[in-house]
């Protein structure tokens, strides 16, 4: 892991990470300190009982399920805020989905910025590099950026947009120079596809 000295100590914060692979949340829990404890935002509450991958996340005890509908926004916000208010870390895949590339990031959703501003906690950008394709001998790097302060910004439309842009820029910088791995052989492809579904491959992410 690169940039461990940038991780805030003994204080809650929101971790916004790139998301090339379903296994990424487990890497976060493995690489980051036990205190403060880390929780992962997602998956959707309705999916918690379907699919073995979602069940594994549920059994792990690290998930904060959410409801995507606007009518449930208040409940979703309360769940996320409760994690931060208890002094824990909330990790969010800012892209809102799996990415198909490691050296690029799709435009971020505004959820990470909104929650960080509501909780008044800093945002730590994190690039996960090396998990797009799974195969033996693969090197995985977690690259943390400087915390992004939320002071001076309001949790309104303008504040959320500005903070989202700052996070996007920081994550793009962390991915500068990252080259895409060539696809592995049949076994590596099979293992990768076993853990991941990408129905949007005809809509590639934009460069960070």
Regions picked out by a protein language model, each given a short descriptive name:
Residues 3:
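Short phosphate-coordinating micro-motif centered on Lys-Gly-acidic
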Residues 8-70:
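Catalytic core of membrane glycerolipid acyltransferases/transacylases, capturing the structured
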